[in-house]
Amino acid sequence: MISADGAIALGLDFGSDSVRVLAVDCQHGTEIDTEVVYYPRWKKGLYCQAAQNQFRHHPLDYIEAMEQAIRQMVKRLSEEQRQHIVGIGVDSTGSTPAPIDEQGQVLALRPDFADNPNAMFVLWKDHTAIEEAEEINRLCRSGEFADYSRYIGGVYSSEWFWAKILHVTRADVAVREAAVSWIELCDWVPALLSGTTAPQDIQRGRCSAGHKSLWHPSWGGLPPRAFLAALDTSLVNDLDYPMFTDTYTAERPVGQITAEWAERLGLPTTVILSGGAFDCHMGAVGAGAQPYTLVKVIGTSTCDILIADDQRVGDRAIAGICGQVEGSVLPGWIGMEAGQSAFGDMYAWFSNLLSWPLHQAALTQPEWQPQLKQIESNLLASLTCAWAQNPSLDHLPVVLDWFNGRRTPNANQRLKGVITDLNLGTDAPTLFGGFIAATAFGARAIMECFEQQDIPVENVLALGGIARKSPVIMQVCADVMNRPLQIVASDQCCALGAAIFAAVAAGAHEDVPTAQRHMACNIERTLIPDPVQVVRYQQLYQRYQQWCHTAEPHYAPVTKAIH
């Protein structure tokens, strides 16, 4: 153990668009400084085809943005503060895997794969592997093998590890022949900084392995060779089998920073790297989550985390969620994951739709661009304000929040968004009110998924930019869920959670609960449900559910006729 007094831990949060670094005082939890850097290639739209649901990140985006963010922030610290940095923790989106060669190099870092999207990190929201996910689900339910989807909610998603590997392996012969393994982003960054990227040296995180890779101790780790070979023999012939057997909780040290990376980042060579995990899981820890608190990490999508004890769960498999994994959030507790595939992304879509004439005007009248950009940037806030001033629920359109598929309950990425109950009196603010209600209805469906299976939801916490900046939206969530909604007083809970794990790995705190007591974030305010609105939203929620049951069959896979 080292003294927490004066010690500083860094949390690295790799998001969809940018990386954030946060420096935190290990003793008092003070957020000392932060820096955000956007991924340059991603910002240009490179390697992505939205119409085909292809979203890829070049590893150089992560490296360059991370290096710039850490160096810029460290420069602002005093020399004494720099020398007191003891650890780095890492969280990332997920599942965001990439293929690696026998040296552990991500293929896109090699000249022969530098511009090949299949050699890059396949971002969480890439849905190119829908058919492969359905193959995995069919095999799990075939009776030929044990149901290896049992502990991930019973449905394997196209957003996850094996589906993406299977898709890329079949789509790209060169990548298939060059890759010997795949690695999640949250595992790769600690390995990169500690010089442990060789496949046999990688410390695989319990969080990513348990929630996305079908790893579970009851069947000895990953599914058996025969199961993967039944999907595609390349999974066991071209790739190492097993890719890994052991997994580690995030407070376990991965290693010490290499001399090269210490110099590049301006850090002491004594810095310890803790294990990686997904952003929402570490965000729950940063928010100070306790058992049976539903933590909603709200951004472009949501990830919902709930911690339960093994005695209550027993050997039950909770259906419809994104996994139940011992140690994925807090060591010794079962971490349960759920989520909505689109939350802020739905609002952004609506804003982009309404902004089309602004973009056209900017093309024809370039001198108007500053004013038009200002109008566009204020559009969502203006819509929210206009609807809040007259939140009529009598003619509120019912919207299904499946614009990016559905993650929970019961993952189905074939689903599409649906807008119903329009009339000639429906204006833009009213329709946007329908969008707000839809995201709240999706949140309630997740809560009910837990409660209907005897997993109680005793408290609800919300964190992220939308949670803090949009009280109207959060009040609707409180009314729809009919629960007090606690808003966490930080926009950086994911990075804060990563810093908490770094502090434990470095020895500044004995365990994660102790580190949470010193470092976790406070509650900023609590929103109370309005009883009158609760009744009205209950009626709308029932109509939402009716439309869900009506619409879903229309997105079932089309059976091809045999001639």
From Swiss-Prot:
What is the main EC category here? transferase
Q: Cite the EC number.
A: 2.7.1.16
* Homology family: Belongs to the ribulokinase family.
Keywords in alphabetical order: Arabinose catabolism, ATP-binding, Carbohydrate metabolism, Kinase, Nucleotide-binding, Transferase
Annotated Gene Ontology cellular components are: cytoplasm
According to UniProt, the reaction catalysed is: D-ribulose + ATP = D-ribulose 5-phosphate + ADP + H(+); L-ribulose + ATP = L-ribulose 5-phosphate + ADP + H(+)
Query: Which Gene Ontology molecular-function terms are recorded?
Result: ATP binding; D-ribulokinase activity; ribulokinase activity
Q: Which Gene3D superfamilies match?
A: 1.20.58.2240, 3.30.420.40
Q: What is this protein called?
A: Ribulokinase
**Which BP terms does GO give this entry?**
L-arabinose catabolic process to xylulose 5-phosphate
Q: In which pathway does it act?
A: Carbohydrate degradation; L-arabinose degradation via L-ribulose; D-xylulose 5-phosphate from L-arabinose (bacterial route): step 2/3
InterPro entries, per database record: ATPase_NBD, FGGY_C, Ribulokinase
Taxonomically, the superkingdom here is: Bacteria
The cysteines covalently paired via disulfide bonds are none
